[in-house]
Amino acid sequence: MKTFLQNIPKVELHLHIEGSLEPKMMFELAKRNNITLKYKSEDEIKKAYDFSNLQDFLDIYYQGANVLQTKQDFYDLTFAYMKKCKEQNVVHTEIFFDPQTHTARNIPLKDVIEGIWQALQKAKEEFGISSFLIACILRHLSEEEGLKTLDELCLYKDKIKAIGLDSSELNNPPFKFKNLFQKAKEEGFLLVMHAGEEGSSEYIKQALELGVNRIDHGVRCQEDLELVKQLAKSQIPLTICPLSNIKLKVFQNMQEHNILKLLKQNLCVCVNSDDPAYFGGYILENFIALDETFKLSKDEVKKLCINAVNASFLNINEKEKLVKQIKAYK
């Protein structure tokens, strides 16, 4: 089964590029940019990755992002992730980045976007992997700050496909950003939002009301049977991240995870890695972890992979081509 999981064509839709910063690269970039880390070794960093909730993780995540200073840093970070995609047979990926995490440190937005973008283009040429870029607004900050960031992002419509919402979910509901997402839509961006990870199913409903194309996480939809039915009917995708959910105690263990239950209820759920450097695995490791717990059938794996294609922002022809490849895969 591992070989089957390794080689099946995969699409990843929930990946924070800052969350793919491996400890080794964190040290390399800290050295390159003359930054002192509070950790003495890679092992010490890994020990710190014992989180009890989302906030614990975010505190370390934002600290790690400090080593990202130059366009070259963003290029190297992104290209390292794209190499991983090549190894794990990810054929298309839609990557999140957090503009405000970097502009708050006086890093020019242009450097962030161009560094990431150039690495994505290089991966397209070298590995044939297609990709889109999604800019996430930080929900623990104000809508006003988010709107200023959105204005800047409008200069890069040729490079940014969608606007997202991430960071601390509790007490930062989607409606806090109602005006921002309305403006993003008017500007022609697609919309995605993290909702229903630590926040309740109510947050998912708010996100749907704001017209999102996709929900990131969404596992707490199960608290509301009507919502589950609505999601099955509308086929609004949920980009689910199993290892992340265990690491951040959204579920206590993999047996409790509801992704297969939601799949059986005909929701458009797919498998993703979220912040792989912090949560102990990329997309393949997430599939393997699910298989170890639930003994996935090949049909279930194919369905999860096809859902990811259908949930993507690829055009209809590209989707059909990929779905055919997955269906034909043995």
From Swiss-Prot:
Keywords in alphabetical order, please: Hydrolase, Metal-binding, Nucleotide metabolism, Zinc
EC number, UniProt record: 3.5.4.2
Active-site residues per Swiss-Prot or TrEMBL entry: 197
Q: Name its GO BP terms in alphabetical order.
A: adenine catabolic process; hypoxanthine salvage; nucleotide metabolic process
Q: Which SUPFAM superfamilies match?
A: Metallo-dependent hydrolases (SSF51556)
Q: Which reaction does it catalyse?
A: adenine + H2O + H(+) = hypoxanthine + NH4(+)
Q: Name a GO molecular-function annotation.
A: zinc ion binding
| Positions that bind Zn(2+) | 14, 16, 194, 274
User: What Pfam families does the database record attribute to this sequence?
Assistant: A_deaminase (PF00962)
Cofactor descriptive note: Binds 1 zinc ion per subunit.
Report the coiled-coil segments: none
Give the residues the record marks as binding substrate: 275
Whether Zinc counts among this entry's keywords is yes
Q: What cofactor does its activity depend on?
A: Zn(2+)
Keyword Zinc listed? The answer is yes
Q: Matching InterPro entries, A to Z? A: A_deaminase_dom, ADE, Ado/ade_deaminase, Metal_Hydrolase
Q: Where is this site: Important for catalytic activity?
A: 217
One GO cellular component from the entry?
cytosol
The entry's family comment says: Belongs to the metallo-dependent hydrolases superfamily. Adenosine and AMP deaminases family. Adenine deaminase type 2 subfamily.
Q: What does this protein do?
A: Catalyzes the hydrolytic deamination of adenine to hypoxanthine. Plays an important role in the purine salvage pathway and in nitrogen catabolism.
Q: In its UniProt entry, what is this protein called?
A: Adenine deaminase
Q: Which organism is it from?
A: Campylobacter lari (strain RM2100 / D67 / ATCC BAA-1060)
